[in-house]
Curated annotation (Swiss-Prot):
One of its GO terms (biological process) is L-tryptophan biosynthetic process. Belongs to the TrpF family. The lineage of its organism: Bacteria, Pseudomonadati, Pseudomonadota, Betaproteobacteria, Nitrosomonadales. Its EC number is 5.3.1.24. It comes from Nitrosomonas europaea (strain ATCC 19718 / CIP 103999 / KCTC 2705 / NBRC 14298). It is an enzyme of class 5 (isomerase). This is N-(5'-phosphoribosyl)anthranilate isomerase. The keyword Isomerase applies.
Amino acid sequence: MRIRVKICGITRLEDAMAAVQHGADAIGFILWPQSERYISPEEAGRIVKCLPPFVRAVGVYVNPDKSWVEETSATAGLDLLQFHGDESADFCSRFHLPYIKAVRVRDGLDLLQYAQHYAGARGLLLDAYTAGIPGGTGHVFDWKLIPAELPLPWILSGGLHPGNITDAIGQTHLSAIDVSSGVEVAKGIKDVNKISAFMQRVRSCEDVRSS
């Protein structure tokens, strides 16, 4: 099975094109103004217009107002919403676009119950827990905390980079990945060599799986 990859925290057209060139399935835009990787919806929209067909544009939000999601998703031309804060399942379902719900994984969190609560989500994004920080920390969580049978599709995130992605795939049997800081030279600035190395390792793991 092909592993789907989203490269998140894109702020520049050249980085989006590098991600696409190396096989990314989705591009993520941080539409939370407090983030160091924030991009305006207008600039995100200019990048989205350059994406080829079937590469999805994902907007990342943290506890937004409904009007902010509606306005920015339309301006940017998004395909998918990703909620990374404390948004309720009811709030996430209020929009005309499908959504992913991020969850910061830690000991004591019942992921099965969480998945049932957000049953309307397209999937769960599993990220590392760091107190007071919604995501993008570059930290890895204990992958053994992922249940064998989650009732929703899930995406592995949190501290992934070319040096650990092979282990991540081997240990979790994932089918989708979200990477941001692991392919950067600075916050919001991607490194084409790191993108290339990351994607090469992902595809090599696919080859091993299919052999």
